[in-house]
A protein has these predicted regions:
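Short, Lys/Arg-rich flexible segments
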Residues: 1-84, 90-91, 102-151
């Protein structure tokens, strides 16, 4: 994944937080990664539509198109889980340059010969899918609670 960090907190009236507080820890640890993966899917889908298509002027020859490097990685920790959505390394390691733009130099720290403007694709995807993400996460967690209660 890229070194650039974008933190997103989704709070739809606190529904997800309230649901997590009522869930037993064992159930949270099992269902939260599933919910995060479901929540990452709309962001990935939207970002893939927004990113420059293969063959754009700054495309890296011989590497996977940037569109195909957008993935989610779910990381589990002792008390929580997180979803990291972004361009995977090594083929997508230039994703942050596309997202934020950059100066053109011939050597590191050398004179600037031009500037490549930013073409944001991740941040707009996050903003556009915020309610869909919250709904997906909430739905998966609710299904997990129903499944747990029916056992």
């Amino acid at each position: 994944m890229s070194k650039t960090k974008v933190n997103v907190t989704i709070d739809e009236s606190g529904d997800v937080d309230r649901l997590l507080q009522t869930m037993p820890d064992v159930l949270q640890h099992k269902q939260l990664p599933k919910a995060l993966r479901a929540g990452a899917k709309p962001i990935i889908r939207d970002a893939k539509q927004r990113v420059s298509q293969p063959g754009y002027p700054g495309d890296k020859p011989g590497k996977e198109p940037l569109k195909n490097t957008i993935h989610a990685v779910i990381r589990k920790y002792e008390y929580t889980s997180i979803a990291v959505v972004g361009c995977t390394w090594p083929d997508g390691n230039h994703g942050w340059l596309v997202e934020f733009g950059h100066d053109i130099t011939r050597t590191k720290g050398g004179p600037v010969f031009g500037h490549v403007p930013p073409y944001p694709f991740m941040r707009p995807a996050i903003d556009a899918t915020r309610s869909e993400v919250a709904g997906s996460v909430l739905l998966v967690l609710q299904m997990g609670v129903r499944e747990f209660n029916s056992q």
